[in-house]
Amino acid sequence: MTITGIIAEFNPFHNGHKYLLDQAEGLKIVAMSGNFMQRGEPAIVDKWTRTQMALENGADLVVELPFLVSVQAADFFGQGAMDILDRLGIDSLVFGTEEVRDYQKIADLYTEKGAEMEKFVENLPDSLSYPQKTQAMWKEFAGLDFSGNTPNHVLALAYAKAVAGRNIKLHPIQRQGAGYHSVNKDVDFASATALRQHQKDQDFLERFMPSVALFEQASKVIWEDYFPLLRYQILSNPDLTTIYQVNQEMAVRIKEAIKTAQSVEELVELVTTKRYTKARVRRLLTYILMQARESDLPEAIHVLGFTEKGRQHLKSLKGQVSLVSRIGKEPWDAMTQKADQIYQLGKPSIAEQNFGRVPIRIETN
């Protein structure tokens, strides 16, 4: 049987995600971000709610990406997620993209010339942002030309890099309907961005979300809910360069900007430069909110939920892969668990995220 991997955030889960799961074959394993997202923001609803949505709509097994995998630039995000899915035995990866290309050929190219390609990136001027450097690399070696407004395509290239040298086939699926950043309501498939923006519009949600009741019952958060905490972390920390990935230049800019910024959005605007994209600045602010430090990734894989089919697969992995299904006295990943505790501070109504939580089971889907 085919074992298909999907790397996802489901922030929140919508019809486009359901379409992707419908297109996937065999046993479907999702490696999903926890409570903080790749572009440096809190999930609108918590990881358990999103796991339930995924299982109700076609996923067989959902595992969690650790905090230091999920809140990363595309390449590191893709690499970390692929490492986990590879260990779970996937033989193909399905993903949505704005531009369907021969990603397998791109992966083969990276297998062959990866070292040379990375050297090329290292030698590019530091005035360029990391995405600009990556795009220059793909243009040089693969003749790819694209605008930076296609985040799924950028992630797809990161996945192609991450599967290089592994026995995993890539299956791109044309992204349906609205673009990633689109807030348009008059489309066949709405984007997660639009759903977050129009979260109080009942009719809109019902049109585009398969598990709308789950979404409506859940506590919802936005970055602004954490702004007082973020301000406190910035003001009370004498040396921000002790935080993961924060350099001297960014530390100075953030300390200066917090004097006048009245919101997270304003802070991001003030700190962003040509070289430091908004997504990168948001990630740095997320690291500061967590007081994140460089740390090893957990050896074990945290299971968030499964169907009967998923449970059988987990059983077949026993002894080969270290799995955690209940977080008790032994932490799974201290950094992720700290992030979960801080996530809970966004709204008093958010349920406990770790202790006593067991994987969500769904009999059939």
From Swiss-Prot:
ATP binds at residues 7-20, 96, 152, 175. GO terms for molecular function: ATP binding; ligase activity, forming carbon-nitrogen bonds; tRNA binding. Gene3D superfamilies: HUPs (3.40.50.620). GO terms for cellular component: cytoplasm. Its EC number is 6.3.4.-. It catalyses: cytidine(34) in elongator tRNA(Met) + acetate + ATP = N(4)-acetylcytidine(34) in elongator tRNA(Met) + AMP + diphosphate. The keyword Hydrolase does not apply. It is found in: Cytoplasm. Keywords: ATP-binding, Cytoplasm, Ligase, Nucleotide-binding, RNA-binding, tRNA processing, tRNA-binding. GO terms for biological process: tRNA modification. InterPro entries: Rossmann-like_a/b/a_fold, tRNA(Met)_cyd_acetate_ligase. It is an enzyme of class 6 (ligase). Disulfide bonds: none annotated. Catalyzes the formation of N(4)-acetylcytidine (ac(4)C) at the wobble position of elongator tRNA(Met), using acetate and ATP as substrates. First activates an acetate ion to form acetyladenylate (Ac-AMP) and then transfers the acetyl group to tRNA to form ac(4)C34. Belongs to the TmcAL family. This is tRNA(Met) cytidine acetate ligase. It comes from Streptococcus pneumoniae serotype 4 (strain ATCC BAA-334 / TIGR4). The lineage of its organism: Bacteria, Bacillati, Bacillota, Bacilli, Lactobacillales.
